[in-house]
């Protein structure tokens, strides 16, 4: 029998049309909003979990206010009663009911669909044996239903699903899970879940949480967000243990104060140290963002003096206009061992100082201006570092005729020191530069000359070799050239392009005695391959070395047919034509260490990187780093590194590191890292983590042991203590905040370095 098709128009069948539309219109938003917040999943989970099937297609051709009914049999009695039977489909513009039978009664203002009933819209799929819709009180009831939130991968059952225009949505005898059907590793069972109209939170009553059919905990009353908007409430706790803190439990409480700012208050209980309070306040506007962190631990139980311990930090970045920016980083802590003992989300336990700055910056095509206050919080018994209070920098550049460029770099700084007996200084510097840069596809050339004039006013210099007033003027000239030669070649059977790129630089800087100038912001740089052509041996301006030198270097690349670098080798060295007279830069040889760099993409899975500096005077390696990586995917990699420094502050450094991430079974991942001090024959850090990640839950177990750098009462640093810890994290996706399974990979790979610099 050919199915009958009936299209109902408001003019012809107004009451029947009205009976169907309120049902759709009133439940669409509450159900959609509920599923969005409760079922939010990570990107990883959405990739691995099967999504509920939804075959509904929006009927775009139906205008608003019109429904379409298709059935095998249709009976209409006196415009008061309509009955449909056999493969009944009731469709409006964006929803559909399919049933064996359906009745529309004008007298009772009810629509009843029975027999294998299914309701679908783009977000929701419901199956039952009966749907009752009453348009008089705007109420829909679906008994013994199975529901699926199709776009957000959640599902459950309800003894009764009720949608009421005034009371909202109510599910009685309801279960909820984001696990695949038949594989409900976790499940929430509640007497009721209600969502009131125009409210952003729902309420579950008498809720039991089951894992593998075992009840884990019970909540008589649970309020949860039903929109994607931020909501005030408890976040997932963090549990861990370490030799420094003992057992530690953190319970964050989130405060949604305003769309543009929020706060998190986190009590942290540590069995060894007591109760700590951590607070975080964030704000974000169209042009500004910032964060305030305050941590306070009263009467540290593990301290011999039961001292109060604290940490604070304020950061801000903002745009005052299109050209003006401001940045702030202000911080402090109670003692040198705070980070070592209590940890930090912002600093490393090996840090020797905290950097503070307040900056105002102006940027344009020709002029850049920067005004900064720079200070340091020194940890331990280290020499007090000079702070710039303030430092003004101005850079101006303009094009001249015939390809020439003219730029001026200038600075004005006031240097102070927390140590009241150290010298202080005001420094002014200006350096005009005239250059001729030429560049094309086969090479480049640069001719540059500059004059560097610096003036100092130094104070508190009694008992030193410094002079009160110093004026220093130096001239500098540079010639730099590079060529690029190419040829077609074969590389392991593939057609490639090989380049040969020789480069040379001559640099001359005049000499002036600088022994009467203090060191305020100057430290020595080491020369890797790129540093050979830098022309600058020190940071800052307090020491500018005299130079009469030639730098030679060469680079060769292998480029495949897809224009990707497969191999790059660089060699370079500085040849000193005269000895340096500036004491801090004096050389014992007529040439620098030979610097080499190697990057090699070995096939599609192996990557290698190496840097080495070899002294031509002793034929010994001064510095080296070697890295080899095997990578199949983002979470499937193995990397081994070795770092060597012959003389770093009087000590030789030789360290071996191993970093790995590998899936060991379906949904199971392992990450680890290990660093060993070869000279001292000891492991300085070990980290291992095991993670199970499915679409609906995740388990992460991490163990770590690392060398700590504690300071004694005299500020002297000890590197013989270790801190061990273990942490366990259990996440049930869909009942609160979730983070991707990559978090453990990110933490485990902290310190991982990209092993190559190929383009």
UniProtKB/Swiss-Prot annotation:
One Pfam family this sequence matches: LptD
UniProt record, GO biological process: Gram-negative-bacterium-type cell outer membrane assembly; lipopolysaccharide transport
Location within or outside the cell: Cell outer membrane
UniProt key word Manganese: no
Principal location: membrane
Name of the protein in question: LPS-assembly protein LptD
Source domain of life: Bacteria
Signal peptide (residue range): 1-45
Keywords: Cell outer membrane, Membrane, Signal
Assigned protein family: Belongs to the LptD family.
Subunit: Component of the lipopolysaccharide transport and assembly complex. Interacts with LptE and LptA.
InterPro entries for the chain: LipoPS_assembly_LptD, LptD, LptD_C, OstA-like_N
Protein role: Together with LptE, is involved in the assembly of lipopolysaccharide (LPS) at the surface of the outer membrane.
């Amino acid at each position: 029998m050919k199915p009958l098709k009936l299209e109902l128009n408001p003019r012809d069948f107004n009451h029947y049309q009205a009976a169907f539309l309120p049902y759709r219109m009133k439940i669409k938003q509450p159900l959609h909003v509920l599923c969005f917040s409760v079922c939010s999943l990570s990107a990883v989970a959405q990739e691995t979990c099967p999504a509920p099937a939804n075959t509904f297609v929006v009927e775009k051709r139906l205008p608003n206010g019109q429904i379409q009914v298709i059935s095998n049999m249709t009976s209409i009695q006196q415009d008061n009663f309509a009955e449909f039977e056999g493969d009944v489909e009731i469709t409006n513009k964006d929803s559909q009911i399919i049933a064996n039978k359906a009745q529309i009664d004008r007298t009772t203002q009810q629509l009843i669909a029975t027999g294998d009933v299914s309701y679908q819209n783009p977000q929701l799929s419901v199956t039952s044996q009966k749907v009752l819709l009453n348009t008089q009180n705007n109420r829909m009831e679906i008994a013994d239903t199975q529901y699926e939130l199709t776009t957000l991968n959640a599902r459950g059952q309800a003894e009764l699903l009720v949608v009421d225009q005034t009371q909202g949505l109510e599910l009685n005898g309801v279960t909820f899970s984001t696990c695949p059907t038949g594989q409900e590793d976790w499940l929430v069972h509640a007497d009721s879940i209600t969502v009131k109209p125009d409210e952003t939170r729902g309420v579950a009553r008498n809720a039991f949480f089951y894992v593998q059919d075992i009840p884990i905990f019970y909540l008589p009353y649970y309020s949860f967000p039903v929109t994607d908007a931020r909501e005030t409430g408890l976040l997932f706790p963090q549990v861990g243990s370490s030799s420094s803190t003992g057992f530690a439990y953190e319970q964050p409480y989130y405060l949604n104060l305003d769309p543009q700012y929020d706060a998190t208050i986190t009590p942290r209980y540590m069995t060894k140290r007591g109760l700590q309070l951590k607070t975080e306040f964030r704000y974000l506007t169209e042009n500004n963002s910032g964060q305030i962190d305050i941590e306070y631990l009263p009467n540290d139980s593990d301290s011999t003096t039961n001292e109060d311990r604290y940490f604070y930090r304020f950061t801000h970045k903002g745009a005052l206009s299109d050209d003006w920016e401001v940045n702030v980083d202000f911080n402090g802590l109670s003692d040198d061992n705070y980070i070592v003992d209590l940890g930090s989300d912002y600093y490393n336990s090996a840090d020797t100082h905290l950097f503070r700055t307040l900056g105002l910056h102006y940027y344009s095509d020709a002029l850049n201006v920067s005004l900064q206050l720079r200070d340091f919080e020194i940890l331990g018994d280290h020499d007090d570092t000079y702070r710039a209070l303030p430092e003004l920098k101005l850079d101006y550049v303009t094009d001249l005729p015939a390809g020439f460029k003219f730029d001026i770099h200038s600075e004005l700084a006031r240097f102070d020191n927390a140590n009241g007996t150290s010298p202080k200084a005001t420094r002014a510097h200006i350096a005009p530069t005239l250059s001729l840069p030429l560049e094309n596809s086969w090479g480049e050339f640069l001719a540059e000359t500059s004059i560097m004039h610096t003036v100092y006013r130094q104070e508190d210099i009694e008992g030193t070799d410094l002079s009160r007033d110093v004026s220093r003027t130096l001239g500098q000239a540079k010639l730099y050239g590079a060529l690029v030669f190419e040829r077609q070649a074969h590389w392991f059977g593939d057609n490639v392009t090989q380049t040969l790129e020789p480069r040379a630089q001559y640099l001359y800087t005049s000499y002036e005695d600088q022994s009467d100038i203090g060191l305020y912001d100057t430290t020595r740089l080491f020369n890797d391959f790129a540093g050979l052509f830098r022309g600058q041996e020190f940071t800052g301006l307090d020491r500018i070395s005299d130079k009469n030198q030639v730098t030679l270097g060469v680079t060769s690349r292998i480029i495949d047919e897809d224009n990707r670098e497969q191999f790059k080798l660089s060699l370079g060295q500085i040849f000193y034509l005269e000895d340096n007279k500036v004491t801090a830069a004096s050389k014992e040889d007529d040439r620098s260490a030979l610097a080499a760099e190697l990057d090699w993409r070995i096939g599609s899975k192996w990557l290698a990187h190496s840097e080495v500096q070899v002294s031509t005077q002793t034929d010994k390696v001064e510095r080296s780093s070697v890295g080899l990586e095997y990578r199949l995917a983002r979470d499937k990699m193995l990397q081994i590194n070795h770092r060597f420094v012959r003389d770093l502050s009087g000590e030789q450094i030789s360290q071996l590191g191993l970093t790995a991430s590998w899936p060991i079974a379906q949904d199971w991942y392992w990450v680890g890292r290990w660093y060993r001090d070869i000279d001292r024959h000891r492991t300085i850090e070990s980290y291992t983590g095991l993670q199970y990640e499915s679409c609906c839950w995740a388990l992460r177990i991490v163990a770590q042991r690392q060398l700590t750098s504690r300071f004694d009462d005299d500020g002297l640093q000890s590197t013989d203590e270790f801190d061990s810890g273990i942490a366990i994290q259990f996440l049930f996706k869909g009942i609160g905040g979730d983070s991707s399974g990559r978090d453990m990979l990110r933490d485990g790979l902290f310190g991982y370095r990209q092993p190559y610099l190929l383009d």
